[in-house]
Amino acid sequence: MNKRSLGSTNFEVSEIGFGAWQIGADWGVEVPTDTALESLSAAADAGVNFIDTADVYGAGRSEKIIGEFIQGRDDEIIVATKMGRATSDWNDSYDEISKAAELSCKRLGVESLDLVQLHCI
């Protein structure tokens, strides 16, 4: 799998990433957790080290599954998460962003987030 530098970061990410919207099961058929973990493992085995998710995917379910997957390998996998749509009263204040980041860290089981994107802002 080819890798590229991610902007001005020190991250080397795979040219193909794993989009984790569906494992959150907002719409369509719910993906069982074991199937989601198998899919993430298959992607990692193929060289994918970049996962894209959001706090709103399955009301945090996607982040929780990814958190389970990256335990013990979080230095190998780069996770990009999005925030800004989980509540209808979202604002882009420091407090709101800090709270959303803290909740994402908790679901992912990490101390800090690799990459944060503001969702539909």
Residue ranges and their predicted role:
Residues 21-23, 54-56, 82-86, 118-121:
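Active-site beta-loop-alpha junctions enriched in small/polar residues
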Residues 19, 78-81, 110, 115-116:
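Non-cysteine beta-strand/loop elements that form the S-adenosyl-L-methionine
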Residues 22-34, 83-98:
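Active-site mouth loops of central-metabolism enzymes
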Residues 65, 69, 82, 96-103:
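Generic beta-strand or strand-like secondary-structure segments
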Residues 88-121:
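Glycine/proline-rich, positively charged
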Residues 1-77:
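N-terminal binding-site loop/beta-alpha segment at the start of enzyme catalytic domains
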